[in-house]
Amino acid sequence: MEPDPKKVKLDIFDFPTARETRTPEEVAESYAEAVKSHPFYDNVHSAIDFYDSGTIKDGRGQIIGVVLREALPKYAASMASELLASAAVRTSLRSMMFGGESPLSGIAGYFDYRGSPVELKSRKTSFTYEHEAAWPAVFPVVDYVSELYRHVAPERWKAQNDAIPDVVRIHGTPFSTLTINSRFRTASHTDVGDFDGGYSCIACLDGQFKGLALAFDDFGINVLMQPRDVMIFDSHHFHSNTEVELSFSGEDWKRLTCVFYYRAALGEPASYAEYRRRLEKSKQDTSFTPVVSNVRVKENGTNLNRPSPVYPIFLSPFWVPMVAHCLQHCASEAQCVHDAMTADGSRLAEVMFGEPLSTSDGIPLRGEEEKLKANSDSASRPLSRLGGFSETNLMVSTAVEKKKYLNSEFLSHFISAQLLDMWKQARGKWLELVGREWTHMLALNPERKDFLWRNQSEMNSAFFDLCEVGKQVMLGLLGKEAALPKEEQAFWTMYAVHLNAACAEELNMPHVAMSLRKLNVKLKDFNFGGTRYFKDMPPEEQKRRMERKQRIEEARRHGMSSGAHEKRANWLTNDSFDYQTEDCVFDYAQHKWVPPALHAKEITKNVRSGELPTREGVVRVLVVLPDPQSKVDCVDCKLEVSETVRCSCEWERLMSSPAVHRVLAAAQRNLQLPDSVTHDNIEIRFAFHSRLPTDMCDFVVLQHVLSCIPDDVLASAYIRRSAALCSGCVFVVETDVQCRQYYTLKCSVRCDYDAVAPLFFQQLHRVSYGTKAARVRTKGELESLIPTVCCARYKLQGSPLNTTVHVVAPAPPR
């Protein structure tokens, strides 16, 4: 289906203006207003980071969500992401969920448009309408998600399937609508408008990122999702995303997610009236045969658009085996320990982990002045004065969305064939010369990352030729003889991003080689200073360029006068009964792809249903302590660290915790092995790490053992050795040297913290366990040691040692 010329032209040049970038004061005011109703929740606000497949239920046994790891076939996710990536565009409609900024988000499928200025309601979204020929690319991923949903929540799936009007189904599934989000960290919200009797599904289609977990804000649970992961969940619970975890400022990342749901308003009487009106109108057109011949009214249930009630969960590290699919073999045993550990007055957590699950006066949280804005990755940078267009993040990210408009297939609809041919030739010539020079540079230095632009080269002349053609393409798209300054800004930004991508994708150059900054400088030469090169050229070259410029202008004007832009009915005015015209059969056998139902059966085979059985026998827990390397009566931090460290703000902040001072004043924990502890049917034994017993147990707890094993290979081997002793799972209790808010901190604060944190925690380990120069690791370093499957991370709240508990399955990954 050809794109609508008028709409596309408006979109091409719809870039943020200088005013739209707003002053810092306006941005701050907008942010403060947005987070009042939609706050951001960081990783620190939760107790559990859940990494594996599992079924998460609330305090009354109702499903919050079912997460399935790598549940989508690669081909299905890839096909869908390739099409849907362009659906996520800058939109102010969801700015309140993005700290007052416009996120990259969009909808596809069908939508009701209630409360929208769009005149015609209850129909295809503009994206599906404009991409109807390519739309079947989403069918596999929609089918696979639907079958996963049906297998894990059959009653909800059936209720949704029975309610959705057939005319607005996506490929026969119980989904009417897709919401596509790109690089969008959402603040706390519920999905208003989703069908109350069903669930929503979210899939991560593509990305390279860390963090950005799906957080269930009222339950203290984060679900980490990576590409191909799927979660079926109650979207009427408040949910959000945690911070993106960047190692350094400006680190590149991407993330594309898709939410699948039934938009309940499409099943309300007003929508049915619209379907019938369009159907009756279509009957007057004898040349049109609708795909759907009648509209069957269905019972839509009661949709109140209210948040789901919250029935809290008591969390502990032993809660994880109760929900993780790969640990269901030890779920009943874990529930025994969990119930005892979370009972009022219980001290089991201190016995097993060395400290309680929560400490009220532990290391204090950061003030807002020390943190980055939650949506800071999208914030605009100051305008660059180095070149011909604005290099703000907002301008460049908008251009990334629109660079497709300079592809030949798009241009063929809007400029003359003659001008299009000139564009192809000029673009191809420049890329050929760039490629030739880049090959020569790599031959001299294979490690080279930067392209050396030679102003007297043939490539430089070809670039100016391409710019001449590009200028006429711009005017051809505008349909006029001169462009406004803001239109030039928009076009040249898009032009530079397009060429940068072409060098990377077609010539396999690093993105930084032909950087936007480099292209910007050369565009400035062309737009503002190119004449100084022209006057120094030989007369014959000047004549050639003048004649070429005239030919390009004539080619552009020929396209404007020849009726090349034949208009068709656009989406806004489309009033036809075109429901399901985009649908078609997808032949999985022909592609040799596993049918969705069989795939879902395999993926969900370990999903637990029903209540956990009661454990009758004894639950045996082995707690392993570090060998006592030395006896330490007390540590005087004033004598142990330099005055520079002691006087730093970060050291003072860490030492301000009363809980820290209790640790410093307490007796060493491992001078001798504690006696065994029996609590109901739970039996807890202790061992030093160099003298592990040989008899089997249900669970092994490694209490700060790895901190006294500095070698990573040996530490990893020790986890494997411990896992061989238990039938259930291993709990790896260790200090995370990075503070809980690490990835939300400003760079300067992070650097100050890094300078003192290892020494601080080493002092506490020396007091608590007698460990000399403890190896305190980051979360990433700890998780890299795990040789099998890390199911989750539990964070002891307010812990003075910043203690975390990684729950490790004994079996190796499949």
Curated annotation (Swiss-Prot):
The keyword Hydrolase does not apply. Keywords: Dioxygenase, DNA-binding, Iron, Metal-binding, Nucleus, Oxidoreductase. The record marks 525 as: Involved in J base recognition, conferring specificity towards J-DNA. Fe cation binds at residues 189, 191, 239. InterPro entries: 2OGFeDO_JBP1/TET_oxygenase_dom, DB_JBP1, DB_JBP1_sf. GO terms for cellular component: nucleus. It catalyses: thymine + 2-oxoglutarate + O2 = 5-hydroxymethyluracil + succinate + CO2. The DNA-binding JBP1 domain (DB-JBP1) is necessary and sufficient for binding to J-DNA. Monomer. Binds to DNA as a monomer. This is Thymine dioxygenase JBP1. It comes from Leishmania infantum. The gene is JBP1.
